[in-house]
Each structure stands twice: as C-alpha cells, then as structure tokens.
Amino acid sequence: YNFDSRSAVLQHTWTKSPKTIWLFRFSASHSLTSSLEAAQDKLDYPHQLGLKGLFSGIFPTFRFGNYLGLGPRNNSVFKESSYAFTPYVSGSLNRKAHTVRLTHTTRRNFDNIFSPFAPAGYFTFGNAMTALPGIKNTGNAFASFLLGEVYNGEESIVRHPSYYRKNFYNFIASDEYKVRPGLTASVSVNFEVASPRTEKYNRQSTVSFSHINPANGKPGALIFAGREGIGAALQPTTVRAEPTIGLSLSPFSNRKTVVRFSYGLSYQSVPLYGRHFGTQGFNAAALFISRNDQLESAFRLRDGVPQNFELPPFLDPTAANGTDADFVDPSGRLPAVHQWVVGIQRELP
C-alpha cells in the first residue's frame, strides 16, 4: 500500500514576566493511506472468471479450509485520508508558594475512508459437500471448490466513502503548593468535552431497542441519522471532570528520600469508529449461508452470486435483519479508571 504523512507545527512562547509564561501552539497533520489493489477494479476479474452477480472488478477471495486460499485478504481495498487540527494554549503563573498552570486544547478530527470488507466477495468451501455420508474425515474443501459448491459467502457493497467528524475539547487547571521545605501538595482538574462521531452526509445507522422492528413486532430496528427526528449524531456529547491530587514529602527532613502519593480519576473516550462501522442501510453486507452443508451449498459459482437482498441505499428499519448488525451505544457511559500511586525515590550515595 501507499502511505503519506505530513504535519506542521507553529509555536510561540510569551514570557510576560519572570513569573508568568504563556505558550501558544497550533498543529496540523494529514495522513493518506491507500492500497495498490484499488487499481485492479478496472480489470473486472469476476467477468473474466465468469462469476456473475458481483459489484466490483477486484479479484474475489476463495478459501479452502487448510489449503492456501486465492485472492486478496479482507479489507485489501481501501483509501483513508485523515486530518487533525489542534490549537493549544497553556500558561504558568508563579505566585509565592503556588505554581498555577492553565491549559486548553481543541482537537478536530476528520477521517475520510473507503474500505469495504469483501468488495468482490469472500467465499468459503468446506469438505462436507464432498464427504461420504456418516463417515468422518472424508471430503475435501478444494474438491468442493472445483465443483463450485460454496459453503458460505459474503459480499460488501459500499457505494460511497464515509466522511467522519469528531471534536474534542480539554481544559486543565492545576496548582502546585509548596507547603514547606520537603512538603508539596498538588491538585488538578481536567474537564473534557467530546462530541460524538458525525458523518458529513448523515450516512450513519444503528440498531435501536426503543424502536419496533416491523418484521416481528419486537424491539430492535435500524434507525438512521438525520431522519425521523434523529439528529446527526447517534451518541450524546460527553462532559466529564477528571480530578487528580498528589502529595510529595521528604520524611525526617531527609532530602535524599522522597515519598509520593497520588490519586487520579480518568475516563476513556468514545473512539472515532473507522471503516464503515454503523453505516448499514447506506452500505450492505450480503451473507450467503448453506442451510445444510452436507446436502446443499449456499450457491454454485456457475449460477452466479445470489441477488436475494436489497441493494443500498435501503433505509428501512429491517435493513439489518439477518445480518451481523452494528450497534452504537447511545447511553454516553464511559469506562472510568481510578488510579492510586505510592512511590518512593531514594538518592544513592
């Protein structure tokens, strides 16, 4: 694959006085990653193989049990272009026994990606179709391939790239107080505000358990961003405060020994889900599974790939039925980490 990365940083330090220093920084970065297989699309390998029903010209993927397979690996066709812009401001103010630090960071992420899982199909062949009835360890997966009897298969249909956006804001205030020689206390509070992932054209979806699926009348239906009263984001904006306290002391006025105690609370962030997670309905992942792998294949290669599914865009509550549905947690709950640290530092002779 091809990889290109660029970044630029602009920084200025302003010393207002010996006790007050400000730092201003702005950074921008860009990375572009693309696969070489993307150029194969124009060759239309499925047509050359006589395999009908596929929506990409990439060479299909065939797997035969323990044999070496044919075709590219999954997600071999991709192009991802990511941008990040990060303004940063920090100030340090010394006032007698106090050192106060103020920090603010804003980060804007843009992730533009095209990466179908199996653009020209992923087809698996097993030994059951060529095995003798009731006799174990018979049959051959490659023989099933020669007969064209597909055990199971999947085809990814991604019509458009996904253009994800996410913002992050961070505010930190800390104070380091020298109580007396050999004793220092510190406290800080980190406020973080993180916006959820959005898509430039609202091409996002998730399973909602508060919506009824019309296929069976039970909770669990696909919902779509920007439709039927649903906002552009499928998760809430998270706001959290992360406090930290610490104490360092030199016992018995011994400057060669320092004991440190600290406690901190932090939260993990909701990731910027990449690839095409949470885009069902706008994209499709057609599955083909044998109902009885000893008697009937999912389909025969000579008949072409079945077309018994809705082509995207299919913005319907039932669009994820019968698939491995994507779920974007709408609760806004974040994993919390409580950390206690005790350390002893000793200067050796």
Predicted regions and their residues:
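Short acidic-glycine motifs
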Residues: 1-349
